[in-house]
């Protein structure tokens, strides 16, 4: 288990205690699906949020931010960017996104994501094919 994945599990465990099952995205999520090291530089976590995504005001985009921010603070992270909903601890960056934007953005339905449990921690992760659809949409969005 990589250090970043262990850190994700620590955060996801706290989210689970708040009734939140997070979606692990980005390179770290892809590592869990493929078993390959994609050299994740950060941790991308999606939770429930406004389906308007970037169109929604920063303060309203991520639901339960009023609970997530103090939880991250207790874990030693500092809130550094409201627009990206980014937290940092030393050289590690955690960014929160809204999972409700996924289907409109990439065609991937939240209902079709894979639910996993590792060390008693529940989280969602896309399949390899879903990651491909997400990365294709990202490349066209840039």
Name the predicted role of every residue range.
Residues 1-142:
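Compositionally biased terminal segments of proteins
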């Amino acid at each position: 288990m990589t250090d970043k994945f262990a850190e994700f599990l620590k955060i996801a465990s706290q989210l689970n205690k708040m009734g939140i099952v997070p979606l692990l995205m980005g390179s770290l999520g892809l590592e869990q699906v493929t078993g390959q090291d994609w050299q994740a530089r950060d941790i991308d976590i999606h939770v429930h949020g406004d389906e308007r995504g970037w169109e929604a005001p920063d303060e309203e985009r991520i639901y339960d931010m009023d609970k997530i921010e103090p939880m991250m603070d207790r874990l030693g992270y500092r809130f550094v960017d409201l627009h990206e909903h980014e937290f940092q601890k030393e050289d590690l960056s955690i960014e929160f996104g809204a999972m409700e934007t996924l289907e409109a953005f990439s065609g991937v339905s939240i209902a079709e994501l894979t639910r996993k449990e590792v060390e008693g921690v529940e989280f969602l992760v896309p399949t390899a094919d879903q990651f491909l659809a997400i990365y294709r949409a990202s490349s066209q969005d840039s």
